[in-house]
Curated annotation (Swiss-Prot):
SUPFAM superfamilies: (Trans)glycosidases, Galactose-binding domain-like
Active-site positions on this chain: E184, E253
Subcellular location: Secreted, Extracellular space, Apoplast
Origin superkingdom: Eukaryota
Database matches in Gene3D superfamilies: 2.60.120.740, Galactose-binding domain-like (2.60.120.260), Glycosidases (3.20.20.80)
GO cellular component, one term: apoplast
Gene responsible for this protein: BGAL7
Expressed in which tissues: Expressed in flowers.
Protein name: Beta-galactosidase 7
Entry's EC annotation: 3.2.1.23
Signal peptide interval: 1-25
Keyword Magnesium appears in the UniProt entry: no
């Protein structure tokens, strides 16, 4: 009896433990309408924040701002080459601590979407693949290749195991509600033929076997193998419909802006157009949407891909590179999220009916037993509309969506922005004058003697030699010439067929010149005249520089990098041209630069005694600079102005803040003074900063700095520049503007700084834009500037009711809609 009683108690104990465990778990599934959480259909709003593109100290603030902006989830890729830089040697430290990042999301009360890939694209170096993978025998990426599949499965399994061990999947009570395998393979699958289909089937089976207890995604993958869920990526996904009728309409990448390339302009996507794309998606049946990016961040070190992706990955996201609110985008979307959430039951359970109102205007009605919710969408790119709907008139601007949660009152219109615009600026304090020391890069052995670390017959691709350990690779060979050589003449050139992103050439220790890629032409011919060849042995030294490895396209891993030849000397004798191909000569190779290998950027560098503090050179190639500075006071984000420098890399206290290239200006054409949000967006539309450096300012995370005492900035200058203008600043809100519509409330804030003055205010039909507002033909009879000043000046934030009650009668305006234009100084 005692034994039987004990067995019964033990059984009850295990049942209790199991019940408690299940109570903590979250059941994530889906039907044809939506992702379901614990059996309930959900509207889910997500945003991409990539943990390596910020610092661990920044994560809580970024995630909380995303939550305050109305998001339910944070999405991130997992970056294979960052975590496994050498085969079976892993790094999950610092800002690579993905487990800590997911737990930080959980601590904020948000869900997580984990896109393991492990191909990520993401404008990340080599698409996230480690280069050692490429250098394995018989390797082909993203196809039926046993070596690749084994390595992909190994890394994917490791990440899943790490998440399971920390109980981070929703099925274990964690925040991860969705995971992704592969990435945008549908864009390239046709290039791989039957093996592409077999590979994607294998991916699905492999992922499914890992038993994570939440759905798997495959983005941009029509007819994704079951049970994978296909999703859409793009600027607009309202016209997208899943090929599988049991899959909900999901959008994994709504591109909030675009990335920047060196030599390119700054992309800009308006808040109106981004909100329009979101509202259209939910109007047409979407229920899951993710912003790519919600915070773009910074490509620290050498992680930027492309080639030619800049260090800044700001992406014109709702949170800027430094973590500040990008207004009005952040606030305008927050208001939309609030309205959409109020309609969640209608959007996920309601019967859908659609009415074509003509002239590209459509209404959509979601009806439940409790009531109805409506959208009125105007996709006409030029004409505003006065729409009569259910017996009422609604003004729906061109290229906008009006949202009516009760099918009666307009709660939101995507083109009617009632959120402030924040103009960020550098603080006005006088910059600290930096005292620089310098030393040359020790390159004489390569330039004069052609001496390297390894020797090969013929030219070898840069990736194969460096394993991506460095941006730099020396190619060096020798050539014997005598007077009788048919090549010899007074008119000779060095000709190089190159795939180097930047090429520097030396002959017999003399600099011949350089060439770098422009306009995306990464296959080019370099040819320069050489006057210093000698009878006897001649040394030719070529420095190949990579600026991020290709990250997208079919078979992108096999794209050439470096100097693939031919390399030749060309002699011109009258009409006769004689060419001597050196490609199959014996070549010496030297990986990296000596200063990198000696870690001159480290604060513990043993070469500190060799730095000079006299006769600071400017315009000198291959030069190291170093200076001490004090961290700017306060908590605002810190930036360093590298104007005056050429190209290179910068470190703060030994930590790389990325590549710099402020001497590379964008073209002078393609920018407009006015940006019209109407009409389909592309990365060139509304671009700005023509004729200016693609990137002048570089992010210095506060966690890289010593708050008290000295800090060290180290620069490696590749092309030649002047460091005397380098200075540190903080980024603050300088001006706040708003152009709010009547019958709304506008919230105004200088982001933790007091509002100091009202520069302009007018209620009626004000003209112009932020920085150039003017009084229109009518305005309220109360002094708008005094009214706003009373409400706002001296405060950190204020709320202004945009109405005639606040600003007085506007009889002169007639029946036309009234607006408040206001500009505040911080």
């Amino acid at each position: 009896m005692k034994m039987k009683h004990f067995t019964r108690l033990l059984s009850l104990f295990f049942i209790l433990i199991t019940s408690l465990s299940l109570a903590k778990s979250t059941i994530v599934s889906h039907d044809e309408r939506a992702i379901t959480i614990n059996g309930k259909r959900r509207i889910l709003l997500s945003g991409s924040i990539h943990y390596p593109r910020s610092t661990a100290d920044m994560w809580p603030d970024l995630i909380n701002k995303a939550k305050d902006g109305g998001l339910d989830a944070i999405e991130t890729y997992v970056f294979w080459n960052a975590h496994e830089p050498k085969r079976r040697e892993y790094d999950f430290s610092g800002n690579l601590d993905v487990v800590r990042f997911i737990k930080t999301i959980q601590d904020a009360g948000l869900y997580s979407v984990l896109r393991i890939g492990p191909y990520v694209c993401a404008e990340w170096n080599y698409g996230g693949f480690p280069v050692w993978l490429h250098n394995m025998p018989n390797m082909k990426f993203r196809t039926v290749n046993p070596s690749f599949m084994n390595e992909m499965q190994n890394f994917t399994t490791k990440i899943v195991k790490m998440m399971k061990e920390e109980k981070l999947f929703a099925s274990q009570g964690g925040p991860i509600i969705l995971a992704q395998i592969e990435n945008e393979y549908g864009n390239v699958i046709s290039s791989y033929g039957a093996e592409g289909k077999a590979y994607i089937d294998w991916c699905a089976n492999m992922a499914n076997s890992l038993d994570i207890g939440v759905p798997w995604l495959m983005c941009q993958q029509p007819n994704a193998p079951q049970p994978m869920l296909e999703t859409c990526n793009g600027f607009y996904c309202d016209q997208y419909e899943p090929t599988n009728p049991s899959t909900p309409k999901m959008w994994t990448e709504n591109w909030t802006g675009w990335f920047k390339n060196w030599g390119g302009k700054h992309p800009y996507r308006t808040a109106e157009d981004l909100a329009f794309s979101v509202a259209r998606f939910f109007q047409t049946g979407g229920t899951f949407q993710n912003y790519y990016m919600y915070h773009g961040g910074t490509n620290f070190g050498r992680v930027a891909g492309g080639p030619y992706i800049t260090t800044s990955y700001d992406y014109h996201a709702p949170l800027d590179e430094f973590g500040n609110l990008n207004q009005p985008k952040w606030g305008h979307l927050k208001q939309l999220h609030t309205v959409l959430k109020s309609m969640e039951k209608s959007l996920t359970y309601g019967n859908i009916s659609r009415i074509d109102l003509g002239n590209s205007i459509k209404a959509t009605i979601y009806t439940t037993k409790e009531g109805s919710s409506c959208f009125i969408g105007n996709v006409n790119a030029t004409a505003d509309a006065l729409v009569n709907f259910k017996g009422k008139d609604y003004h729906v601007p061109a290229w906008s969506v009006s949202v009516l949660p009760d099918c009666d009152k307009e709660a939101y219109n995507t083109a009617k922005v009632n959120t402030q615009t924040s103009i960020m600026t550098e603080d006005s304090s006088k910059p600290e004058r930096l005292e620089w020391t310098w030393r040359p890069e020790s390159a004489q052995k390569m330039i004069l003697k052609g001496s390297g670390d390894l020797i090969a017959k013929g030219l070898v691709d840069q990736k194969d030699v460096t394993n991506d350990a460095s941006d730099y690779l020396w190619y060096m060979t020798r050539l014997h010439l005598d007077k009788k050589d048919p090549l010899w003449s007074r008119n000779m050139t060095l000709r190089v067929h190159s795939n180097a992103h930047v090429l520097h050439a030396y002959v017999n220790g003399k600099y011949v010149g350089n060439q770098f890629v422009k306009d995306g032409k990464f296959d080019y011919r370099f040819e320069r005249k050489v006057n210093h060849l000698v009878h006897g042995t001649n040394h030719i030294s070529l420095l190949s520089v990579s600026v991020g490895l290709q990250n997208y396209g079919p078979f992108f891993e096999s794209g050439p990098t470096g100097i693939n030849g031919p390399v030749s000397l060309v002699g011109y004798k009258g009409e006769e041209t004689i060419e001597k191909d050196l490609s199959q000569h014996q070549w010496d190779y030297k990986i990296g630069l000596n200063g990198y290998n000696d870690k001159l950027f480290s604060i513990k560098s043993v070469g500190h005694q060799k730095w000079a503090n006299e006769k600071l050179p400017t315009g000198r190639m291959l030069t190291w600079y170093k200076a001490k500075f004090k961290a700017p006071l306060g908590k605002e984000p810190v930036i360093v102005d590298l104007n005056g420098l050429g190209k290179g890399e910068a470190w703060i206290n030994g930590q790389s803040i990325g590549r710099y290239w402020p001497s590379f200006n964008s073209s002078d054409d393609g920018c407009k003074d006015e940006c019209d949000y109407r009409g389909a967006y592309g990365s060139d539309k509304c671009a700005f900063m023509c004729g200016k450096p693609t990137q002048r300012w570089y992010h210095v995370p506060r966690s890289f700095l010593n708050a008290s005492g000295h800090n060290t900035i180290t620069l490696f200058e590749e092309m030649g520049g002047n460091p005397s203008m380098v200075n540190f600043k903080t980024v603050v809100v300088g001006t706040v503007c708003a152009r709010a519509h009547e019958h709304n409330k506008v919230e105004l804030s200088c982001h933790n700084r007091p509002i100091s003055a009202v520069k302009f205010a007018s209620f009626g039909n004000p003209l112009g834009h932020c920085g150039s507002f003017a009084v229109g033909t009518c305005q309220g009879d109360k002094d708008a500037a005094k009214t706003v000043a009373k409400e706002c000046v001296g405060k950190l934030n204020c709320t202004v009711n945009v109405s005639s009650d606040t600003f007085g009668s506007t009889l002169d305006c007639g029946d036309s809609p009234k607006k408040l234009a206001v500009e505040l100084e911080c």
